[in-house]
Curated annotation (Swiss-Prot):
Its cofactor is Mg(2+); K(+). The lineage of its organism: Bacteria, Pseudomonadati, Pseudomonadota, Gammaproteobacteria, Thiotrichales. K(+) binds at residue 44. This is S-adenosylmethionine synthase. One of its GO terms (biological process) is S-adenosylmethionine biosynthetic process. The keyword Ribosomal protein does not apply. GO terms for molecular function: ATP binding; magnesium ion binding; methionine adenosyltransferase activity. It comes from the Bacteria. It is found in: Cytoplasm.
Length: 386
């Protein structure tokens, strides 16, 4: 890639149908983990007009009222009237959950957490860059801020015409590989019939965009596309079918890094799609926080039933203060990449996952998000002797 370029990422609101599905899957996971930390959960959700279908494989001693939980998530997300796309109080809830295959169970469970085998094969990536305060890429960072502001204004009632479904997209102009200004902002939000297009356009610019985007990133040439189709009345599951795991780029780095292909929501942490990706972020963030590189991507891969990873790779894109191979050796010394130790060290057997399902799994420094800590940075810096 040239040193001067445009780069774009998107985010979606918690009322986007795919995100509604993610929230349901993670809410079910959370409720099970409250009762049974040894549960095996792979929960998928589909939402469409007037219905929610929950399916997957769950092995647990816990009892969860799936129907009530699904209804609560839908209404809490703002879908409490059929005119919005679905009504959690009256929609149909279909439960098609089965148990995990015994063949998988015998290959994964080892008695002790330390010896736990990976729940499946797969490759995962972690990433960090010093572009933003949370060490996230700029385009996804600002896209998430726009969507969080939209939700805040909707929930507070300040913009009473807002409805739950929305999307944002930010295009950053880079010069010499550094973000310089925002070239384009796209924001589409569902609304009711009381607002005109001009009023909506002006309110979104003044109350959402200008409240979260730094002035220094906006130029006279910055382009705005606010509800560019003109009307966004039909949204949520009525407008589009929603499925768990359909927003994996929104969940991660907005396309600024590789992705191993595995989704997160609805999966307990024995599934390395989730725990391996969280560990990758933890490693990459600590490398950048330590000053070992300006930008870092980590790949880790696992075999089903095997505790240790089959591979580890570090790429600093030429920004490393020491070689990538040297950083890899430090990572192997400082971080325990066995699946059970990842779960233990990041304290992943807690009911924290519904919070992860909106506005990205990475870059939000909440107490529950242990993979966002930079507690290994000083250790890495000292070991690297920089």
């Amino acid at each position: 890639m040239s040193k001067n370029y445009l780069f774009t990422s998107e985010s979606v609101s918690e009322g986007h149908p795919d995100k509604l599905a993610d929230q349901i899957s993670d809410a079910i996971l959370d409720e099970i983990l409250k009762q049974d930390k040894n549960a095996r959960v792979a929960c998928e959700t589909l939402v469409k007009t007037g219905m929610a279908l929950v399916a997957g494989e769950i092995t647990t001693s816990a009892w969860v009222d799936i129907e009530e939980l699904v209804r609560n998530v839908i209404t809490e997300t703002g879908y409490d009237n059929a005119s919005k796309g679905i009504d959690g109080r009256t929609c149909s809830v279909i439960n098609a959950i089965g148990k995990q295959s015994r063949d998988i169970t015998q290959g994964v469970d080892r008695g002790s957490l330390e010896d736990l085998g990976a729940g499946d094969q797969g490759l995962m990536f972690g990433f960090a860059t010093n572009e933003t305060p949370t060490l996230m890429p700029s385009a996804i960072y600002y896209s998430h801020l726009l969507m969080r502001k939209q939700a805040e204004l909707r929930k507070s009632g300040k913009l009473a015409w807002l409805r739950p479904d929305a999307k944002a997209q930010v295009t950053l102009a880079y010069e010499n590989d550094k973000p310089k200004f925002i070239d384009t902002i796209v924001l589409s939000t569902q609304h009711n019939e009381s607002i005109s297009q001009k009023e909506l356009h002006d309110a979104v610019i003044e109350e959402i965009v200008k409240k979260v985007i730094p002035n220094e990133l906006i130029t006279k040439d910055t382009k705005y596309h606010i509800n560019p189709t003109g009307v966004f009345l039909i949204g949520g599951p009525q407008g589009d079918c929603g499925l768990t795991g359909r927003k994996i780029i929104v969940d991660t780095y907005g396309g600024a890094a590789h992705h191993g292909g595995g989704a997160f929501s609805g999966k307990d942490p024995s599934k390395v799609d989730r725990s391996g990706a969280y560990m990758g972020r933890y490693i990459a963030k600590n490398i950048v926080a330590a000053g070992l590189a300006d930008k870092c991507e980590v790949q880790v891969a696992y075999a089903i039933g095997v505790a240790k990873p089959v591979s580890l790779m570090v790429n600093t894109f030429g920004t490393g203060k020491i070689t990538d191979n040297q950083i890899e050796k430090l990572v192997a010394e400082v971080f325990d990449l066995r699946v059970g130790k990842i779960i233990e060290n990041l304290d992943l057997l807690r009911p924290i996952y519904r919070k992860t399902s909106n506005y990205g799994h990475f870059g939000r420094e909440l107490p529950e998000f242990t993979w966002e800590k930079i507690d290994k940075a000083d250790i890495l810096k000292s070991a690297a002797r920089i």
